[in-house]
From Swiss-Prot:
<feature type="binding site">
    <location>
        <position position="223"/>
    </location>
    <ligand>
        <name>ATP</name>
    </ligand>
</feature>
<feature type="binding site">
    <location>
        <position position="457"/>
    </location>
    <ligand>
        <name>ATP</name>
    </ligand>
</feature>
<keyword id="KW-0436">Ligase</keyword>
<keyword id="KW-0547">Nucleotide-binding</keyword>
<dbReference type="GO" id="GO:0006422">
    <property type="term" value="P:aspartyl-tRNA aminoacylation"/>
</dbReference>
<comment type="function">
    <text>Catalyzes the attachment of L-aspartate to tRNA(Asp) in a two-step reaction: L-aspartate is first activated by ATP to form Asp-AMP and then transferred to the acceptor end of tRNA(Asp).</text>
</comment>
<dbReference type="InterPro" id="IPR045864">
    <property type="entry name" value="aa-tRNA-synth_II/BPL/LPL"/>
</dbReference>
<feature type="binding site">
    <location>
        <position position="168"/>
    </location>
    <ligand>
        <name>L-aspartate</name>
    </ligand>
</feature>
<feature type="binding site">
    <location>
        <begin position="505"/>
        <end position="508"/>
    </location>
    <ligand>
        <name>ATP</name>
    </ligand>
</feature>
<dbReference type="InterPro" id="IPR004115">
    <property type="entry name" value="GAD-like_sf"/>
</dbReference>
<dbReference type="InterPro" id="IPR004364">
    <property type="entry name" value="Aa-tRNA-synt_II"/>
</dbReference>
<dbReference type="Pfam" id="PF00152">
    <property type="entry name" value="tRNA-synt_2"/>
</dbReference>
<feature type="binding site">
    <location>
        <position position="423"/>
    </location>
    <ligand>
        <name>L-aspartate</name>
    </ligand>
</feature>
<feature type="binding site">
    <location>
        <begin position="214"/>
        <end position="216"/>
    </location>
    <ligand>
        <name>ATP</name>
    </ligand>
</feature>
<dbReference type="GO" id="GO:0005737">
    <property type="term" value="C:cytoplasm"/>
</dbReference>
<keyword id="KW-0030">Aminoacyl-tRNA synthetase</keyword>
<dbReference type="InterPro" id="IPR047090">
    <property type="entry name" value="AspRS_core"/>
</dbReference>
Length: 557
């Protein structure tokens, strides 16, 4: 590095940090050329860094003669007022620091680039001011969480990322281990086991901003690699954990976003949430609760008669004084079909029913019917969730938290035709079910609690099992050999405290805060919808030599 560069770097000011104190003084900035405009003898160069953009007004055309978009420049000149709000730099010396090829996308807040192009050239996409703001906001939220938990007496502990593959949950990402023949590490789906062992070890208050890995299909709110705010505490009840998490979010939202959250967060039982909203993660920013409309079709022959006579149910959502256009109804009908039901509607203007309905309110009623209430209510819940986009029911910066409790301990897997753990097999049964939970799988409840924000599950937690006898019974009831978790069972025999915890999705939280529709928008280098990292093309094939030498002394047969 030459001395001139070193001097410039020390003098450099971020564009966003320029204030009236710099007026009429010589300032130095560094950034990328965004646009070049010519007006008579004047040349206007718009230069931007991660904080803002500024106009550089130049009379010397030789200085801008060879500049193009995204060239990296260092500008030194006088700071002047452009108007009552903005500044400009005049009489500049412009130094070309690094030449840029023609960029494959428009590097502005609004870009017409397809997502695949943005991900392929993510380093360019990250220059967009909106992306830099998202990264900065993520940093502030993470820092606020760390500081708050530190004040509450938590310590941050890093747990292993090369660990043991265990049953339950999604598929593991496996890593071959050279040190032991035909053996694999697994990347953790959660720090679950280690944080429980930390409680046995006397840590009492643990947290970690943890990277976790799940080999599952990507969705708008899922990635194979993501980050969670993970914590665990000893000698806490469910209510104490819920109060702790509520206070954490109230403080973080106040400090980072200057938003005062309503408290206490509403608490809904799992069954209540499903009956009212058709979901265990309801969006409480608007109403439109689900209703049993079977009685409306009891007295006269109609298209639901046979189903009702066979014990089926008709469910509905009333939209007082609201009407859906054809495009919206078509989209909702497809959503219903994807959920295994048909969607009908009736309003005082139009109807897909074969007979009129006597409704007390003007507006629209959406209807589905099915022999199974679970199927009908699940479909209606999905429709209700989609309505907010078609009817503009919510406003930006509107946040509605709620807790869901009294979850089932088990759920029946229709595909596998067996009972599985509804959350994870370390969740404690509620006290009234401790004696015989394995004999009442359809009724037994767990001490699980989920935090929901704006219709997304933000995090899930529970009181953990700390009694080795209860843990053995639960595992055996799921067909899991307790010896697969012998290291946990052994630890429980050395005075394990009552403990509880939670994992909160940081990426999902930032998606909601930034009001974007998928978590790829708030991650620096996400995978695409197919799980591919576009710039490096990972996952990729490796040299066969690298594979064969892993177990060279013990080749795979």
């Amino acid at each position: 590095m030459n001395l001139d560069n070193a001097k410039c770097f020390k003098q450099r000011v971020f564009i966003g940090n320029l204030t009236s104190e710099h007026l009429n003084k010589t300032v130095t900035i560094a950034g990328w050329v965004k646009r070049i405009k010519k007006l008579g003898e004047l040349n206007f160069v718009i230069v931007g860094d991660k904080t803002n953009t500024i106009q550089v007004t130049c009379k010397n055309k030789e200085q801008v003669k060879y500049l193009t978009r995204e060239d990296l420049v260092i500008v030194k000149g006088k700071l002047k007022r452009l108007d009552s709000v903005r500044f400009e730099i005049t009489n500049p010396t412009i130094t070309l620091f690094a030449k840029s090829k023609t960029p494959p996308l428009i590097i502005e807040d609004k870009t017409d680039a397809l997502e695949e192009v943005r991900l392929r050239y993510r380093y360019l996409d990250l220059r967009r001011p909106v992306m830099q703001k998202r990264l900065a906001l993520r940093h502030k939220v993470t820092l606020a969480v760390r500081n708050w938990l530190d004040q509450m007496g938590f310590i941050e502990v890093e747990t292993p990322t090369l660990t043991k593959s265990t049953p339950e949950g999604a598929r593991d990402f496996l890593v071959p281990a050279r040190i032991r023949e035909h053996s694999f590490y697994a990347l953790p789906q959660s720090p679950q086991i280690y944080k429980q062992l930390l409680m046995v070890g006397g840590t009492e208050k643990y947290f970690q901003i943890a990277h976790v890995y799940r080999d599952e299909d990507s969705r708008k709110d899922r990635q194979p690699e993501h980050t969670q705010i993970d914590l665990e505490v000893a000698f806490y009840t469910k209510e104490m954990v819920m109060d702790l998490i509520q206070r954490l979010f109230v403080d973080v939202f106040r400090q980072v976003l200057n938003i005062k959250l309503k408290k206490p967060f509403p608490v809904l039982k799992f069954a209540e949430a499903f009956n009212r909203f058709g979901s265990d993660k309801p969006d409480l920013r608007y109403g439109f609760e689900l209703e049993d409309c079977t009685d409306l079709f009891q007295d006269s022959p109609n298209q639901f008669t046979n189903l009702i006579n066979a014990g089926g149910i008709v469910g509905g959502i009333q939209l007082p004084n609201l009407y859906l256009d054809e495009v919206s109804f078509k989209a909702l009908r497809k959503l219903a079909k994807d959920n295994g039901v048909s969607l009908e509607f009736y309003s005082d203007k139009a109807s897909s029913l074969k007979q009129p309905l006597d409704l007390p309110l003007a507006g629209t009623i959406l209807l589905v019917a099915h022999k199974s209430k679970t199927q009908a209510w699940t479909a209606l819940g999905a429709i209700r969730n989609e309505l907010k986009y078609h009817l503009n029911l919510v406003k930006p910066n509107q946040y509605s938290f709620c807790w869901i409790v009294d979850f089932p301990l088990y759920e029946f897997d229709e595909k596998e035709q067996k009972w599985v753990s509804a959350h994870n097999m370390f969740s404690n049964p509620q006290p009234q079910w401790l004696v015989n939970f394995e004999n009442h799988k359809a009724e037994a409840l767990s001490e699980q609690y989920d935090l929901v924000l704006n219709g997304f599950e933000l995090g899930s937690g529970s009181i953990r099992i700390h009694d080795p006898e209860v843990q053995t019974r639960l595992m055996q009831s799921l067909g899991v050999d307790p010896q697969q978790f012998g290291f946990v069972m052994e630890a429980y025999q050395y005075g394990a405290p009552v403990h509880a915890g939670m994992g909160l999705g940081l990426d999902r939280l930032m998606m909601i805060i930034n009001n974007v529709d998928n978590i790829r928008e708030v991650m620096a280098f996400p995978k695409n919808a197919q799980g591919i990292e576009m710039h490096t093309n990972a996952p990729d094939q490796v040299d066969i030599k690298d594979i064969t030498t892993i177990w060279s002394k013990h080749p795979v047969k």
